[in-house]
From Swiss-Prot:
This is Alcohol dehydrogenase 1. Binds 2 Zn(2+) ions per subunit. It comes from Trifolium repens (Creeping white clover). Zn(2+) 1 binds at C48, T50, H70, C178. An alcohol binds at T50, H70. Homodimer. Keywords: Cytoplasm, Metal-binding, NAD, Oxidoreductase, Zinc.
Length: 380
């Protein structure tokens, strides 16, 4: 047991007091973990677009003050009662979704959508007692998706913590906690392209680049990037993209452009934007008879799309995915090993690295479109 186990820890956290306002480094009190919980010492964290979306709070109920952050790597400081798969000193990745191991989803080999620990962006408390483990001078501070990694210490449900190889560099593998696995798994676990096949990737942000990386790892020979920003093609080449289409450059639907490029359509398509039109295009650009399209991007609340039923009857398949179909505790350690073996290249996703005291720079980089992933070093 650590010498801080069972005690309240005072540490630094970047607190969002208001929507869209710069985070403030504050001293917070972090309560000990309760039954089924883990307290982690965060060493590295990174900024994901989801953090920015809920920090801006333009499309949902604001919940402040709040500690954001959900991509991170750290070390287990202490564990609550009943936690057996983790112990102090273990290297771990907290994840915004979880694996209770008991529900029908966890017992199914096909699903990772745990009934108990599935992501809940509106919940700012722990599920054990509906209370926060963070406070400032007695005032509770809300959690974010059960992780809140913009803090030197955080408390997470044990089912949302993946124990990993202690030799893995936390400043690299921390980015596997969300976006990279979401795109990577959408390709390798759901689309499953065969060696020598063709894959279209819609949207070349971090998730789309990760989907392209999955296509590269799978041995796809043609990886077609589709994006409205042509300058992204040069960067995407590092992730295996070898052809590029900007829909704005054509006077016909992009699915028709791709069909003409590929003699009837690509074998697989992965949509990573959340745009309804991109979803339609991704589905309609796959080849009849065997084509598979996978939707990753999150649409707006009231969005809906339509496509002709013949597109299905002609043996095209449309699938959706959540976190790349990875079970956090079971599968994430294996993804880390793929990196350790050199099969998965993470360094090329990391464009910036800053000290914790400069965390607001990470928001600036993302809002300007200058970063893929910015690593935030907790120890300065």
């Amino acid at each position: 047991m650590s010498n801080t186990a069972g005690q309240v820890i005072k540490c630094r956290a970047a607190v969002a007091w208001e929507a869209g306002k710069p985070l403030v480094i504050e001293e917070v009190e972090v309560a000990p973990p309760q039954a089924g919980e883990v307290r982690l010492k965060i060493l590295f964290t990174s900024l994901c677009h989801t953090d920015v979306y809920f920090w801006e709070a333009k499309g949902q109920t604001p919940l402040f003050p709040r500690i954001f952050g959900h991509e991170a790597g750290g070390i287990v400081e202490s564990v609550g009662e009943g936690v057996t798969h983790l112990k102090p000193g273990d290297h771990a990745l907290p994840v915004f979704t979880g694996e209770c191991g008991e529900c029908p989803h966890c017992k199914s080999e096909e699903s990772n959508m745990c009934n108990l620990l599935r992501i809940n962006t509106d919940r700012g408390v722990m599920i054990n007692d509906n209370k926060s483990r963070f406070s400032i001078k007695g005032q509770p501070v809300h959690h974010f998706v059960g992780t809140s990694t913009f803090s030197e210490y955080t408390v997470v449900h044990a089912g949302c913590v993946a124990k990993i190889n202690p030799d893995a560099p936390l400043d690299k593998v921390c980015i596997l906690s969300c976006g990279i696995c979401t795109g990577l798994g959408a390709t390798v676990n759901v689309a499953k392209p065969k060696p020598g096949s063709s894959v279209a990737i819609f949207g070349l942000g971090a998730v789309g680049l990760a989907a392209a990386e999955g296509a590269r790892m799978s041995g796809a020979s043609r990886i077609i990037g589709v994006d409205l920003v042509s300058s992204r093609f040069e960067l995407a080449k590092k992730f295996g993209v070898n052809e590029f289409v900007n829909p704005k450059d054509h006077d016909k639907p992009v699915q028709q452009v791709i069909a003409e490029m590929t003699d009837g359509g690509v074998d697989r398509a992965v949509e990573c934007t959340g745009s309804i039109q991109a979803m339609i295009s991704a589905f309609e650009c796959v080849h009849d008879g065997w084509g598979v399209a996978v939707l990753v991007g999150v649409p707006k609340k009231d969005d809906a799309f339509k496509t002709h039923p013949m597109n299905f009857l002609n043996e095209r398949t449309l699938k959706g995915t959540f976190y790349g179909n990875y079970k956090p505790r079971t599968d994430l350690p294996n993804v880390v090993e793929q990196y350790m073996k050199g099969e998965l290249e993470l360094e090329k996703f990391i464009t910036h690295s800053i000290p914790f005291s400069e965390i607001n720079k990470a928001f600036d980089y993302m809002l300007k479109g200058e970063s893929i992933r910015c690593i935030i070093r907790m120890e300065e």
